[in-house]
Curated annotation (Swiss-Prot):
Keywords attached to this entry: Cell inner membrane, Cell membrane, Electron transport, Heme, Iron, Membrane, Metal-binding, Transmembrane, Transmembrane helix, Transport
Main subcellular location: membrane
Signal peptide: none
Segments on the Periplasmic side according to the record's topology features: 36-184
Residues that coordinate or bind heme 2: 73, 76-77, 174
A GO term from the CC aspect: plasma membrane
Positions annotated to bind heme 4: 165, 168-169
Protein name: Putative tetraheme cytochrome-c type
Binding site for substrate: 89, 95
A Pfam cross-reference name: Cytochrom_NNT
Originating species: Allochromatium vinosum (strain ATCC 17899 / DSM 180 / NBRC 103801 / NCIMB 10441 / D)
Record family assignment: Belongs to the NapC/NirT/NrfH family.
Membrane topology of the entry: Single-pass membrane protein
Disulfide bonds: none
């Protein structure tokens, strides 16, 4: 191989490496931008079928409370850790698909599937030991002496049994759907 050919190959390799590096940075930035954008309350409520959920959420303590801390859609529905977060984002793409395809594009169609959809969320939360709930609420951080007798008793028993939050707190931010007659 001539000196010129070797020099050209080296320049090409460095250019290719540089482009891959820049491409990697752009890719990571785009993924980060996409995650941050789709984690906003504005994005989550941009589909008109989510307006019912949004109105219910606005009635909950997760939206307005004495502490002034507001939990948004992503706080409850999107894991903080990168791996589970990416999986959740990929799985959530099906919701956009169903909105676009017309499966849940009206409040009536959404309500017809609400029990099924709620159960998907509940099963995911149970499987993760209510990971998203525990990012704000954790037995270890609870001051049981400040809770009502009933809450203190229930939280203490739930902790002893190793229960997860969602086992008792379904319908905490959205109305709990009623089980349809034909659900199994």
């Amino acid at each position: 191989m001539s000196k010129h050919a070797a020099s050209s190959a080296k320049r090409f390799s460095l250019l290719a490496l540089g482009l891959m590096f820049v491409g990697g940075i752009v890719f990571v930035w785009a993924v980060d931008f996409g995650i941050k954008t789709t984690n906003t309350l504005e994005f989550c409520t941009s589909c008109h079928t989510m307006q019912t959920n949004f109105e219910e959420y606005k009635e909950s303590l997760h939206y307005k409370n004495t502490s002034g801390v507001q939990a948004t859609c992503a706080d409850c529905h999107v894991p903080k850790e990168l791996g589970p977060k990416l999986v959740t984002k990929i799985v959530a793409a099906k919701d956009v698909y169903h909105e676009v395809m017309g499966t849940i594009d009206t409040p009536e169609k959404f309500e017809a599937r609400r029990w099924y959809l709620a159960n998907l969320v509940w099963k995911r939360l149970e499987a993760s030991d209510s990971r998203e709930c525990r990012s704000c609420h954790d037995y270890a951080d609870m001051d049981l002496s400040e809770q009502s007798r009933s809450a203190r008793s229930r939280h203490s028993a739930a902790q002893d049994k190793g229960q997860t939050c969602i086992e008792c707190h379904k319908g905490v931010a959205h109305h709990e759907p009623t089980e349809p007659d034909d659900a199994s």
